[in-house]
């Protein structure tokens, strides 16, 4: 991806995530990419980094093949959805939404 992701200014840039595309649907910015690692590792990193950047965690859920972390901060809210890539437990699909609160 050539341009920086459309995320809040203080939103953490997860070291293990490669961002591949972004789009806007109405008021919602969507950023996608992948994490080199399993869903649990991705979930733990995302949650810890968001909390460390002073974002509020509204909800989080970790299951065997997917995870969600809903957040708010800096006048925005959204969700980081993590899904195991089909047939590859060492690569996790990342889907981040963010919109005005």
PLM features: residue spans?
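An acidic-aromatic pocket/loop used at catalytic or ligand-binding sites
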Residues: 1-101
């Amino acid at each position: 991806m050539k341009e920086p992701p459309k995320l809040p200014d203080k939103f953490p840039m997860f070291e293990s995530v490669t961002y591949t595309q972004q789009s806007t649907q109405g008021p919602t910015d969507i950023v996608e990419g992948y994490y080199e690692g399993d869903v649990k590792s991705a979930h733990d990193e995302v949650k810890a980094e968001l909390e460390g950047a002073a974002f509020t965690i509204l909800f989080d859920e970790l299951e065997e093949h997917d995870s969600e972390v809903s957040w708010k901060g800096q006048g925005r809210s959204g969700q980081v959805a993590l899904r195991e890539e089909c047939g590859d437990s060492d690569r996790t699909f990342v889907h981040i939404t963010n919109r005005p609160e």
